[in-house]
Amino acid sequence: MDNAFVDKAKDVLAKDTSVVPEFWQKKYKNEANKNWDKFYNRNTTNFFKDRHWTDREFEELRPGHTFSEEKPVLLEVGCGVGNFIWPILERNPDIYIYACDFSPRAVDFVKTNENYTEARCKAFVCDITKDRLVDTIPPHSVDIVSAIFVFSALPPEKQAAAVANIVEILKPGGRVLLRDYGMYDLAQLRFKAGHKLEDNLYVRQDGTLSYYFSTERLHELFVRYGNLIELENEYVVKRLVNLKKSIDSERIFAQAKFQAPIDAGDIEAAMLGTKLSGGYGSAVPESYKTDGEESEILVD
């Protein structure tokens, strides 16, 4: 992502100075789960494609990736209708998945899917900003937490509470795998006036929220507030070109891995905000890589 694009994106965002009135800001934030429930009522299981790309991006999801002598346990937060779950269960026969969402309707779609069996998966309703995960999942029992386009649906002031909730069920050495919308993404730049609630937070026409992350914000949430160790934290860029429609723009995502401390040395490293020695890749806030995977876009 070159400087010319960044400057152009900043200029577009700087022109959007109007924000949604405070009454409506509070309403949209308080009714986030209600509006997503309506979304799934309208679209059922037909809106998103199954996410077959996740184990390519995150090696921890591949069969044979060893965390311990026990079979791996994964929690998918914001599971929706199961688009992440089904490909992973099919490819990784040893994994067990907990799956939660704050939309009761979405969880019902997961439970009624022909591939659902509680021998391998348990779906439940949970608002991770306020409902304790340990009420359903034993403390410090989960190897992997996946958060794929989830934190962007949460108001910024509630994101730290969600991180703290996740930390309670992570094993020592357990990992959070995250991919979400990044700052200056095409979807952010396409919002019209009247959709902005605050910096980087917007409301779609259907009332659902969308927050656009910087790598610095992710570091703040998971390292500063969550005391996790940063293994990766970068932007993933996909360029979109359509000469017929004169479109030349970029989808930008934030992708990161964080790890729960294993021992006192790791805890000290987490508190200092440093990366684990010998970890997976470098955590350079302004680094970018190109990704050819088809992406999802929700914008009006």
What are the roles of these predicted feature ranges?
Residues 142-158:
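A short SAM/SAH-binding and catalytic strip from SAM-dependent methyltransferases
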Residues 1-33, 38:
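N-terminal auxiliary segments of SAM/dcSAM-dependent transferases
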Residues 182-242:
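C-terminal alpha-helical "lid/dimerization" subdomain adjacent to the S-adenosyl-L-methionine
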Residues 47-71, 83, 87:
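Conserved alpha-helix/loop element of class I SAM-dependent methyltransferases that forms part
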Residues 68, 72-133:
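Class I SAM-dependent methyltransferase SAM/SAH-binding core
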Residues 160-175:
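A short glycine-rich, Lys/Arg-flanked "PGG" loop and its adjoining helix->strand segment in the class I
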